[in-house]
Amino acid sequence: MGFINDCFMLKNDEAKRLYHEYAEKMSIIDYHCHLSPEQIANDHVFKNATELFLGGDHYKWRLMRAGGVEEKYITGDADDYDKFAAFASVVPYMIGNPMYHWTHLELKRYFGIDEVLSKDTCRPIWNKVNDCLKKPEFSTKNLILRSGVTVLCTTDDPVDDLKYHRTLKDWSVKVLPTFRPDKI
């Protein structure tokens, strides 16, 4: 068993009771989502682990750069597996950064993977994630629904077209735009 389990970060009996009796069952309001509204509206199916974990995630890119990874493996034209392997090679050095826990929570929660992602575990994790992504329950909307999300706020430029938000207005998850003026 890996370090991510049903009582991860719950250090005493009261914390475990409060979480499992109350918080665990509550819906999630995601105020800062990196999925594009277009991906959600089109129920995008991720082609592989690189697209899912690294596509557009500038936080992971920053950690890869800090770990000395060449840009071609981050936003460049390297092969997708090589990009994922480059990410895996820096994950062990992320201890102390929330991204370390988030990465392993994602692997455990959605893919049942207990192993720590590293250069040594990269290939079997890549294969398992990619096998899962072929199944309908791993489409964008299904991943959101499986997460218990009821409100999801996308990060949008002030001039973005809201057409995809409009197409999602009748979906069970409320998808709202937020103001992110990075390009200004």
Which residue stretches match the model-derived regions?
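Metal-cofactor-binding active-site regions of metalloenzymes
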Residues: G2-I184
